[in-house]
Amino acid sequence: MKFFVSCAKGLEYLLADELSALGLGKATATIAGVNAEGELEQALRIVMWSRLASRVLWPIDEFECPDEQALYDGVRALPWHEHIKPEMTLAVDAHVSGDKITHARFAAQRIKDAIVDRMRDEGLERPSVNTDLPDVRVNLSLRKGRASLSIDLGGGPLHRRGWRGAAHEAPLKENLAAALLLRAQWPRLHAAGGGLLDPMCGSGTLLIEGALMAADVAPGLMRHGSLPPSRWLGFDKSAWKTIQSEARDREAAGLAALKPVIHGSDIDPTAIQAARENAEVAGVAHAIRFTRADVADLAAPEQEIGAVVCNPPYDERLAADPALYRALGNALQKAVPQWRASLLCGNDELAFATGLRAGKKYQMFNGALECALIVCDPIAVPGRDPAQPRELSEGAQMVANRLRKNLKKFKSWRAREDITCFRAYDADLPEYAAAIDVYEEDGGKRRTFLHVQEYAAPAAIPENDVRRRRNELLAAAREVFGVPPEQVSMKSRERGKGGSKYGRFEQRDEFIVVRENNALLQVNLFDYLDTGLFLDHRPLRRMMAEQVRGKRFLNLFCYTGVASVQAAVAGAASTTSVDLSATYLQWCYDNLALNGQGGNQHLLVQADAMAWLEGDRGQYDVIFCDPPTFSNSARADDFDVQREQLKLLRAAVARLAPGGVLYFSNNFRRFKLEENAIAEFAQCREITARTIGPDFERNARIHRAWELKRLG
């Protein structure tokens, strides 16, 4: 019987070899799978033993299918009572390609309808639907007007081994992990007494899969347990029991002989804990040594030969950084130069960044992400000292030169004004369109962090060029500032967009303390688009701090309260900070406490600033108002700074004490101040030029600012 075994793209030839090793006489690689020929018992053996397959599809019919009615009629014509009992549950997976039936979910529903109607034709009850754990899973492949119906013998995706419990970020599917191990020739190296190493092990997928492979544990044993994978009426239960019994015998012998030659490390303690828990469930914890360590501190295992398998971060969500790949390549050359490596890199640029010489390179897909798998044997690169950094590309060198030029230009200004947080680069080279902000940590560690915000590239720029330039920019920044990858935050940001303070990027909850204008401040460089400190307002905050000693200060739309904190440190008699966000008010409270500025004189108010102004009757000597461009919070009326400016400024000016001053600023680039209307209640003059520091002179439209005083 001819049947189909599917797999991820890029694994087809490996799968064909695996099926041949399992005894299939005919196994021909095709797109995303293998066309196989054999008996049902052989197909069931694949369900139990294949480490690479996604599904094993046993055909039950094939027919012409020009349209939806033909699909329904063809399915209804089949004797479904010979495949499923009424009390069983059913699921249908559909994969369609054509111009008449284009929606897989619609096709799956029509198949379910046809099966149910045929069962009723036979005088039987309709089977129920269970999309997660059905008794029988039917598969449709519709291509070029021809429908192929199959039974999914495994009952679902075969990459699920049954041990995964504690998932870490972006886990690798087990069948792709098996492919990396096979490309690294791990079975051969293990048989020769070699070791296995993953220096960025995450939740342990590669190492656990390697341990199960070394112990000869069938992938289907834990996945299916004591039950058969399918209750299809054509399923050969006797053959399955025999296959299962053989697998259990081999598992017992293999686990007993498995030695602790597998090593995993990761800088994230949560990942290490997840890996240990997963290994325990899989029954291979005794064979794997997990340690928390940075890749730069990689220790050499005791085995002289072995395989390195690694899936370093490479998608935008995980902030791929070529410097991290360079550190990985250097560490491997130092620790295990004679080992073989199989590294799944995000693209050719990141593979190149490792500095390793790939003997072979394969195209693979991790889900929808196209990746480059490089195989190095041995890891050592003749004539290269891993301690020496790899030369920057021409583009990266251009960025590095501009960064050094800017740092030289800012040197005297930074020394004179004690500037430790500043913008070092703002799309100075148009093709490298990003902003690079520097944050120097205060206190004992004195680490330097980089906050890189990439502006959205025009749609006409090819994605490969965008990715290459991003990697070159990061490489240059890392080189110039000498910072490790964990101290670089990479984000993408569209030009000219107002608001957007609130989207979450990561969940590191890592704060560092920096200093500005004599105040200590907590910033979070990784979790949100903005950091808690708007660097462009530094001169304006300094200007206000110089005026507030012994005075009452009001901060509207206060965000994290930086201006309030600096006013308190400068000796303000009182500060009042108003914001709708409890998160930002807590941040403000923490910033005040960090500077020893507690007490009732520093008031935090959670409220809509517009509504609060209408009810407040206090008087203030200095008011700072920096509203968002737009706001549509569920807890307050919609806000538009252009539309609401008169109402806002009239209410704020009304709160000024005699001789008081209001500083109004916003970053809406198309903002137009209604000067004539404002002149009826306030003296107003623009002071933008005084509020732009040297580091923002290239982008003088980053914000605008005005000074307002009450008439009379």
Swiss-Prot record:
It catalyses: guanosine(2445) in 23S rRNA + S-adenosyl-L-methionine = N(2)-methylguanosine(2445) in 23S rRNA + S-adenosyl-L-homocysteine + H(+); guanosine(2069) in 23S rRNA + S-adenosyl-L-methionine = N(2)-methylguanosine(2069) in 23S rRNA + S-adenosyl-L-homocysteine + H(+). One of its GO terms (molecular function) is 23S rRNA (guanine(2445)-N(2))-methyltransferase activity. GO terms for cellular component: cytoplasm. It is found in: Cytoplasm. Pfam families: Methyltrans_SAM, RlmL_1st, THUMP, UPF0020. SUPFAM superfamilies: S-adenosyl-L-methionine-dependent methyltransferases. InterPro entries: 23SrRNA_methyltr_KL, DNA_methylase_N6_adenine_CS, RlmKL-like_Mtase, RlmKL-like_Mtase_CS, RlmL_1st, SAM-dep_methyl-trfase, SAM-dependent_MTases_sf, THUMP_dom. Keywords: Cytoplasm, Methyltransferase, RNA-binding, rRNA processing, S-adenosyl-L-methionine, Transferase. CDD domains: AdoMet_MTases, THUMP_AdoMetMT. Gene3D superfamilies: 3.30.2130.30, RNA methyltransferase domain (HRMD) like, Vaccinia Virus protein VP39. It is an enzyme of class 2 (transferase). Residues 42-153 form the THUMP domain. Specifically methylates the guanine in position 2445 (m2G2445) and the guanine in position 2069 (m7G2069) of 23S rRNA. This is Ribosomal RNA large subunit methyltransferase K/L.
